[in-house]
């Protein structure tokens, strides 16, 4: 049986990239994905950009680093997400600690942050709340963008483990003084008419479909971060209802949604009395975002 790439010595960066990708392929990963994972892993460990890896191609790696990479390649080959293996991951303009306490932030959610930052309500918003904060990705990216302003932020999560991770990220980013963390279920515990913006990337996959998710998700990421009830809309419905109580007049609700939930979300928002309802697509052309303003 062939060994993990780091057991071959001496190893240059170039050789490890080749051997690492081949190792991942032997463990069932597609070639393109294996090459990408190997490059990301090496660039993070060497603290350089992906484009700069070629500049380090002939660098001989120290034994301690080789052993560290060996273990990391093994973890990735076993199906553990690279975000958890590395322990940190970039999101928007911040770096987040990532582990099994919370869902891994996705690129689609960065666009949700951008939609908020481009909105008219953002310009005047003073109080912003994130429901189901997870790693804190959304609320901390917004708080980072608002440095030097009078904006204040609240992050809510039902999972104490996820909330502790979000608090660690806030502390690491120097944002603890502008973000309040609340252990709770939904937005119902927030004061009435207190928020200018309510945002959430909630669980939106139907319970019956959760078990069909890829193994690297089911085996490592928290199930509660995916399971949205029988039709995937349970938590979305509750936040829409809560929003009618906690949003200020003209406050706006922003959601990330499932790719087949656009029409349902439009109807739910309009029936709850929201105006200027928008359902938008992500960069892959799928319905991914819904928003509406409270009259």
Over which residues does each language-model region extend?
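Conserved AdoMet
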Residues: 2, 40-118
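Conserved Class I SAM-dependent methyltransferase catalytic core
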Residues: 230-293
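Conserved beta-strand segments of alpha/beta enzyme cores
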Residues: 95, 152, 178-180, 275-278
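Non-catalytic accessory regions of SAM-dependent methyltransferases
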Residues: 1-46, 53, 61
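Conserved SAM/SAH cofactor-binding pocket of Class I
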Residues: 107-212, 238, 260
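Mobile active-site "lid"/loop adjacent to the S-adenosyl-L-methionine
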Residues: 204-235
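Class I S-adenosylmethionine-dependent transferase superfamily signal
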Residues: 142, 217, 239-243
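Helix-to-beta-strand junctions that scaffold the AdoMet/dcAdoMet cofactor pocket
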Residues: 175, 221, 247-249
